[in-house]
A protein has these predicted regions:
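Juxtamembrane/disordered regions of integral membrane proteins
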Residues: 1-139
Length: 139
């Protein structure tokens, strides 16, 4: 039986892809997101954003993909569909419902939560598919 190993190249590419999906998602949701978040306008946000936010985003994506890849080696995930199902299960249990509950207690609009968490759903699905399909084995 072949032993699965972590695919570092897939993790690096996913971390970059996630930044691109984030930009596209918030580009589409821009004005509505700004309104729901109670901010002034997109231009003000772009000029005020610290480079630390981008560094944190890339680090978060890389760490998430590494941990998901590690979990996949333990669960013997061998297909994109298996990867998607596990990633979405983790997302629902550990991310979405926690974020939604917190936002509701902070009196934030549900639509804001759906916009913010919609991109996480897409990224978890993407990571599950890529890491499930693009497998590496120990020699």
């Amino acid at each position: 039986m072949k032993t699965l190993k972590i695919n570092i190249l897939a993790i690096a590419l996913l971390a970059i892809m996630m930044q691109l999906t984030n930009m596209a998602w918030y580009g589409l949701a821009g004005d509505r997101w700004v309104e729901l978040a109670g901010l002034k306008n997109v231009a003000d946000i772009a000029s005020a954003t610290s480079p630390l936010a981008y560094i944190a985003s890339i680090a978060n994506a890389g760490l998430f993909c590494f941990m998901l890849a590690w979990i996949f080696t333990k669960l013997r995930v061998e297909t994109a569909l298996q990867g998607i199902l596990i990633a979405i299960s983790f997302y629902g249990c550990f991310v979405f419902f926690g974020a939604m509950t917190q936002d509701l207690f902070h009196l934030r609009p549900l639509m804001l939560t759906l916009i913010n968490e919609g991109i996480n759903f897409i990224n978890y699905t993407l990571a599950g598919a890529v890491l499930g399909a693009w497998r590496k084995y120990e020699a």
